[in-house]
From Swiss-Prot:
GO terms for biological process: phospholipid biosynthetic process. Disulfide bonds: none annotated. The keyword Transmembrane applies. This is Protein SERAC1. SUPFAM superfamilies: ARM repeat. Keywords: Endoplasmic reticulum, Lipid biosynthesis, Lipid metabolism, Membrane, Mitochondrion, Phospholipid biosynthesis, Phospholipid metabolism, Transmembrane, Transmembrane helix.
Length: 531
């Protein structure tokens, strides 16, 4: 009995230990499922959030960058300093942050006090080595004329900048600053960009044909007889007809003889010289200058200038045309945009006095900041050709004689001794224009002007058969050339100095000077006359 009871108790214990309660198993499974599902949901949410933010960042445009790049759209690659000590260390970082803080203080005070550099300077995070460049740019656009001139002077004296800093100035400055740099003696040529690409020529066309079309597009009515003659002669000639008629012109002494003598040894430039001579006459009329600009004449003349670098006569006529167009202030922006300022800035530094003088006339007519006068065709300033703060005490006017020219008359006589045998001191003293070289050096306060007019023995019956030259007509023409219209009044630009001195070439030059300065319209009168 007792054995049976013991067996029953043992069986109950075994049954109780092997069959756990079902409710505990169910809650354990639920907890495991919750943990797995929660981890999956949380990880998926984080992943989706990251992808959405990354996609939003990729497709969103930072407008602050666009505003910042408005002032730095032309900046070239920055150079890295070779001194590693400047790029590392706490001291360098502190100095950089201090400079930024100072600039912010200056910008804030500029806004309050309305300083000239307030707006652009305060909105751009400019590096330390660029502050001077941007301040000079802002200073060059000041409303105060003295401030602008000082900025241009400081730019011209900068010779330690990197290439990209010169290009930055060239691309960001206004036309007045660019012209001022071109007329500054010490300016670096890196300030001037290359001229814009020239438009391509039309199919089956040439520069000769384009030049003839430009000449034909100019007004042909109400013209002087000589202008009509030059125009008709240029339009009627071509390379083939000129070759066929050349013998006749020489044999019978026609009007083509002076042309044939002036063409030099460049046959390809012969017909172009005909057209350029005619366009020079047209460019003396203001309305015709507008037509030349509207019909692409500035670009075409630039193409000819580049093609005939070895032909000074072609280049001289082209510069005469540009100089005449520069007399019209409303064409200044077109002349600057076409790249002529860069070309003339390089020509100003030429060793050839004639080329430099033509370029100086063009830039002086473009410069309305420091030059009040306008130099007509045939008037060349030999000194000063650059901007100067020195006041002009006297004008020296050189008028050449019958067989002379504006530059040829005043050259030094060639020495019979060979150049190799000359001492170095003698070579240094030699000059092709002594008023520009010697007189300007001895008397820097002078303005030295040379006047050119047509004068060869054959020009008594000039290249234009309808023109009759006389002493009175020549002097009258020079008197008109020396008169420069300022605003609405016709005044004589020589009247701005205290004294006038004449440099006269022989007897003929003396009589021309007498006729010019004894006329009623001339404000200058000789102090003493000698018979």
């Amino acid at each position: 009995m007792s054995l049976a009871a013991y067996c029953v108790i043992c069986c109950r214990r075994v049954g109780t230990s092997t069959s756990p309660p079902k409710s505990g198993t169910r809650w354990r499974d639920i907890r495991n499922i919750i943990k797995f599902t929660g981890s999956l949901i949380l990880g998926g949410s984080l992943f989706l959030t990251y992808e959405v933010l990354a996609l939003k960042k990729a497709v969103t445009l930072d407008t602050q960058v666009v505003e910042r790049e408005k002032m730095k759209s032309y900046i070239y690659v920055h150079t890295v300093s070779l001194d590693k000590g400047e790029n590392h260390g706490i001291a360098w970082q502190a100095r950089k942050e201090l400079h930024k803080a100072v600039r912010k203080v200056l910008a804030t005070s500029a806004k309050i006090l309305r300083n000239p550099f307030a707006d652009p300077f305060s909105t751009v995070d400019i590096e330390d080595h660029e502050c001077a460049v941007w301040l000079l740019l802002r200073k060059s656009k000041s409303d105060d004329k003295t401030t602008r001139l000082e900025a241009v002077q400081e730019m011209s004296e900068a010779h330690h900048w990197h290439d990209y800093q010169y290009r930055l100035i060239a691309q960001a400055c206004d036309p007045k600053t660019l012209i001022g740099l071109a007329r500054s003696k010490e300016s670096d040529l890196r300030f001037f960009l290359l001229p814009p690409p020239l438009p391509s020529l039309k199919e089956d066309s040439s520069t000769e044909e384009e030049l003839r079309q430009l000449l034909a597009s100019l007004p042909q009515t109400e013209l002087d007889e000589c202008i009509q003659y030059f125009t008709s002669l240029a339009l009627s000639e071509s390379s083939q007809s000129l070759a066929a008629q050349k013998g006749g012109l020489w044999c019978f002494g026609g009007n083509g003889l002076p042309y044939a003598e002036s063409f030099g040894e460049v046959p390809s430039a012969t017909v172009e010289m005909f057209c350029l001579e005619a366009i020079v006459k047209h460019s003396e009329i203001s309305t015709h200058c507008d037509k030349i600009e509207a019909n692409g004449g500035l670009q075409l003349l630039q193409r000819l200038y580049q093609l005939h670098k070895d032909c000074p006569k072609v280049q001289r006529n082209i510069m005469r045309i540009i100089g005449n167009m520069a007399l019209n202030e409303h064409l200044h922006s077109s002349i600057v945009r076409s790249g002529w300022v860069s070309i003339m800035a390089e020509a100003m530094k030429s060793d050839r006095i004639m080329e430099a003088s033509h370029a100086a006339r063009i830039l002086a007519n473009l410069d309305r900041e420091t030059v009040q006068e306008k130099y007509q065709d045939g008037v060349y300033v030999l000194h000063p050709q650059y901007r100067t703060s020195r006041p002009i005490k006297a004008d020296v006017l050189f008028i050449h004689g019958l067989m002379g020219a504006a530059f040829k008359t005043w050259r030094q006589q060639d020495s019979e001794q060979a150049v190799i045998e000359k001492p170095m001191e003698e070579e240094d003293r030699y000059t092709t224009c002594w008023p520009k070289t010697w007189l300007a050096k001895d008397c820097p306060a002078l303005r030295i002007i040379s006047v050119e007019y047509d004068t060869t023995l054959s020009d008594w019956r000039a290249r234009c058969p309808m023109e009759r030259r006389s002493l009175l007509s020549i002097s009258s023409g020079i008197g008109e050339v020396l008169e420069s219209p300022l605003h609405s009044e016709a005044t004589n630009f020589l009247g701005s100095s205290e004294l006038l001195v004449l440099g006269i070439g022989r007897w003929f030059g003396y009589h021309i000077a007498w006729e010019v300065f004894s006329s009623k319209r001339c404000c200058w009168k000789p102090l003493r006359s000698q018979k």
